[in-house]
Amino acid sequence: RTCQSQSHKFKGACFSDTNCDSVCRTENFPRGQCNQHHVERKCYCERDC
């Protein structure tokens, strides 16, 4: 199962999974990706849970 948490450090709309992933790694998550949240794309960090 994968748990997601919105990134606290990522600023602005998320268009690059690579950038999101890099920011999530600084937040001690193994990976991250952009996901649609209402009208905005946000960076979500993921880990196995």
UniProtKB/Swiss-Prot annotation:
Disulfide bonds join C3-C49, C14-C34, C20-C43, C24-C45. InterPro entries: Defensin_plant, Scorpion_toxin-like, Scorpion_toxin-like_sf. The keyword Disulfide bond applies. Gene3D superfamilies: Knottin, scorpion toxin-like. It comes from the Eukaryota. Has weak antifungal activity against F.graminearum and F.verticillioides below 30 ug/ml, but not against A.consortiale B.cinerea, H.sativum, F.culmorum, C.graminicola and D.maydis. This is Defensin Tk-AMP-D1. It comes from Triticum kiharae.
